[in-house]
């Protein structure tokens, strides 16, 4: 019979049994080697309030602690929440991690597209042609 994945969807090579874990989202039992695991490092304070907390801090140069969480998902929850994506039959064989896209700078103005006139200031529509 043909096979879909080289590893059978698991990381269990030469092991007979692997203990199950519970999915962080739905609580379903899933083998530990089959679960999709992500280690999340976040700031405890949200981005909008970091400056306020640092200014209100008594200690100079106090670094805010981070929140470390390991999440383990079953396959269906990982696909549903877009942690992993369904890939085509040929792309399933690709083992390199997907490219991480860099965040855009929001404060830099976009360069003008070639062949387009600049937009008028104030966001008002241009005068109609006569």
Swiss-Prot record:
Keywords carried by this UniProt record: Ribonucleoprotein, Ribosomal protein
Lineage, top ranks: Eukaryota, Viridiplantae, Streptophyta, Embryophyta, Tracheophyta
Family the UniProt entry places it in: Belongs to the eukaryotic ribosomal protein eS26 family.
Protein name: Small ribosomal subunit protein eS26x
GO terms assigned for molecular function: mRNA binding; structural constituent of ribosome
Membrane-spanning ranges: none
GO BP terms in the entry: translation
InterPro entries in UniProt: Ribosomal_eS26, Ribosomal_eS26_CS, Ribosomal_eS26_sf
Biased amino acid composition, Basic residues: 86-95
Region of interest (Disordered), residue spans: 86-130
Compositional bias segments (type: Low complexity): 113-130
Record keyword Ribosomal protein present: yes
Gene that encodes it: RPS26C
């Amino acid at each position: 019979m043909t096979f879909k994945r080289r590893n059978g969807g698991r990381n269990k090579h030469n092991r007979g049994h692997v203990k199950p874990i519970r999915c962080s989202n739905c609580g379903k039992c899933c083998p530990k080697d089959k679960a999709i695991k992500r280690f999340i490092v976040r700031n405890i304070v949200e981005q909008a309030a970091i400056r306020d907390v640092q200014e209100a801090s008594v200690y100079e140069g106090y670094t805010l602690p981070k929140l470390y969480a390991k999440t383990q998902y079953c396959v269906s929850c990982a696909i549903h929440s877009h942690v992993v994506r369904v890939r085509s039959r040929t792309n399933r064989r690709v083992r390199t991690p997907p490219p991480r896209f860099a965040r855009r700078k929001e404060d830099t103005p976009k360069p003008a597209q070639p062949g387009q006139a600049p937009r008028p200031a104030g966001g008002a529509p241009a005068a109609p042609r006569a």
